[in-house]
Amino acid sequence: MDTILTVSQLKKVYGGRGSRTTALDGLSFSVSAGEFTGIMGASGSGKTTLLNCISTIDRPTSGVITVEGTEVTALRGKALSRFRRERLGFIFQDCNLLDTLTGFENMALALTILGTAPKAIERRVREAAELLGLEGVLDKYPYQMSGGEQQRVAAARAILTRPALVLADEPTGALDSKSAGQLLRQLSALNQGEGTTILMVTHDAFTASWCRRILFIKDGVLYRELRRGDLDRKAFFAQILGVVSLLGGDSADVL
């Protein structure tokens, strides 16, 4: 499989002399096309900093991040903005839908910004709505949708530009268990059916069990890696809990 994401010797240090905090300490890994990879770790482990660096929200102190052969850490200005719009998709804990736009309009926004032809926007929005079971909310405003529907609209928006990589930061954090399960099933279907490459940060072992591979971060370095392989989700969940118990610290920060 082609490598979509490469993180090499990534380091992120906050603060100055006398007050320096190392969030990432030479972290390296890669993600292949079509993988559904989870990032787990206790509070302060560096997992959110890692996602912020990959998403170009933050810049690393040193190291290299490459997405589809493009060295993201070397991009600046308009080139960086264009790369972010075209090659990365984002799903956040807060779905960030615009209250004055319908579900259709919220989903179409990224394509509109890219200057996509109206007919192509119409076709791709309706295709994404069918994939994610959103046909019934296209004409609704966010306040008329459930939390799970809002988050699935955000997920549809993230994939409409056909990005190389979808970055999800605690996407189920604000959802009840039923809505979280629906979203995770849809993300899994996108990954397996459409080959969407997903990198998801989560503190929740149940959420992580939907991934095919988990990277555990501790003190800014890669602590351990799990692959689901032929395991069913229940068995993989048990494996995840086993590693979490070895991470140390406050388990409530991870589970």
Enumerate the predicted regions with their spans:
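ABC family nucleotide-binding domain
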Residues: 4-5, 10-217
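Intrinsically disordered, low-complexity regions
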Residues: 1, 32, 237-238
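Non-catalytic connector elements of ABC transporters
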Residues: 245-255
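Generic alpha-helical segment signature
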Residues: 3-4, 233
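Conserved beta-strand-loop-alpha-helix hinge in the C-terminal portion
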Residues: 221-245
